[in-house]
């Protein structure tokens, strides 16, 4: 199982295997100690105002982005999906339903393959047919939310 921490040298997000005492950043070679209790109490989300990855304590209800100053609600943080960049193999987070995700490391545009199809029900107002009967206008379809 893997986890993530922020490098104490360059502030990049670094992945590591759970159970290790320290992580060497591949970008700047800084050794960052792993604090198991702090990692277990942390969560992450992507800022709703910019593409910044934010880390916060699980008990927090809101977190302010240091990049764009937007206040983010942590209630929807569990609605994050992950994929691996097809070019540099970096783990990326994205909102469910996204059709593409651009990697912040190498700028490669990744197509989300597992965008789950969803059933959509559209109910328009009832109308009268040529005989004066009230008719329902309901359409059912399936979409993957790709635009």
UniProtKB/Swiss-Prot annotation:
Keywords: Nucleus. It is found in: Nucleus. Residues 82-112 are annotated as: Putative zinc finger 3. The keyword Nucleus applies. Residues 44-74 are annotated as: Putative zinc finger 2. It holds the Pfam family zf-LSD1. GO terms for cellular component: nucleus. Putative zinc finger that may be involved in programmed cell death and defense response. This is Protein LOL4. It comes from Oryza sativa subsp. japonica (Rice).
């Amino acid at each position: 199982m893997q986890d993530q921490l922020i490098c104490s040298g360059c502030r990049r997000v670094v992945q590591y295997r759970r159970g290790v005492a320290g992580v060497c950043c591949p970008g700047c070679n800084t050794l960052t100690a792993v604090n198991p209790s702090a990692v277990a109490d942390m969560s992450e989300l992507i800022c709703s105002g910019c593409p910044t990855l934010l880390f916060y304590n699980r008990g927090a209800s809101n977190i302010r982005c240091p990049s764009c100053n937007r206040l983010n609600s942590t209630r929807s943080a569990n609605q994050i999906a992950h994929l691996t960049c097809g070019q540099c193999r970096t783990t990326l987070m994205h909102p469910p339903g996204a059709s593409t995700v651009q990697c912040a490391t190498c700028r490669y545009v990744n197509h989300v393959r597992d965008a789950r199809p969803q059933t959509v029900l559209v109910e328009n107002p009832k109308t009268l047919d040529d005989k004066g009967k009230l008719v329902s206008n309901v359409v059912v379809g399936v979409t993957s939310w790709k635009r």
